[in-house]
A protein has these predicted regions:
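Residues at structural and domain junctions
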Residues: 8, 44, 74, 147-150
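Exported/periplasmic cell-wall-interacting domains
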Residues: 22-27, 102-201
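Cell wall/extracellular polymer interaction/catalysis modules
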Residues: 22-105, 110-122, 128-129, 172, ...
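Residue-level detector of transmembrane insertion/anchoring sites
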Residues: 11-13, 80
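Bacterial N-terminal signal peptides that target proteins for export
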Residues: 1-11
């Protein structure tokens, strides 16, 4: 039954992932679902990703055409998101952190880093739809905050992560900078999300 469900989901994914508009509502929401739309690229080899650190925005572009845009969470000042030009080189739909997570002690769950001297079984935070662009740095599904909150990765909320995962491939260029030209034209249309009151998974 689980196999059939996954096959039906996989068959419906292209229609669900690639919609007809790059528009989103700029209103902020507190937790809950986060809807983004995406276009199917005409040539997947021309897809590129642009990240604005100052605006915490991700733009997936094909030339001047916006395929998808979404809010993101960037790294805290002590563990910043790296700047520069990169390429996606590893994708993993189901991934857990090898560094940050929990220690499970019977019925107790204690936040802990993997190497912490705390008893119990280590379980990493879920990082679904992982797209790695630099060793230990990637785009992945996770809570999105209005302020920097990650350990350097770029978090995408809910379906934004799944759609991003479908749009990029190994070799997709990624540019991460303080700002992007799209901040002025597309940035104001991006819906903000605030998961700051939501407990970590």
């Amino acid at each position: 039954m689980r196999i059939l469900s996954r096959l039906l989901l996989a068959a419906s994914l292209p229609a669900a992932v690639f919609l007809t508009s790059c528009e989103t509502s700029p209103m902020a929401s507190s937790g809950g679902s986060y809807h983004v739309t995406a276009h199917r690229p005409q040539n997947p080899n021309n897809v590129r990703v642009k990240v604005s650190l100052s605006q915490q925005n991700v733009y997936v572009m094909e030339g001047d055409r916006c395929l998808m845009m979404a809010a993101t969470t960037i790294g805290i000042p002590a563990k910043p998101t790296p700047k520069g030009n990169f390429k996606i080189y590893s994708k993993q739909e189901h991934k857990r952190s090898g560094s940050y997570g929990f220690r499970v002690q019977g019925d107790r769950i204690i936040p802990a880093e993997a190497g912490a001297n705390i008893p119990g079984k280590y379980v990493g935070y879920p990082m679904g739809y992982w797209c790695e662009f630099s060793p230990s740095y990637g785009f992945h599904q996770g809570y999105v905050h209005l302020r920097p909150r990650s350990h350097g990765c770029l978090r995408l909320k809910g379906e934004a992560a799944a759609k991003f995962f479908a749009l990029v491939h190994n070799g997709t260029p990624v540019n991460i900078a303080d700002s992007q030209p799209e901040d002025a034209t597309l940035g104001p249309k991006i819906k903000r999300i605030d998961d700051s009151k939501t407990p970590d998974p």
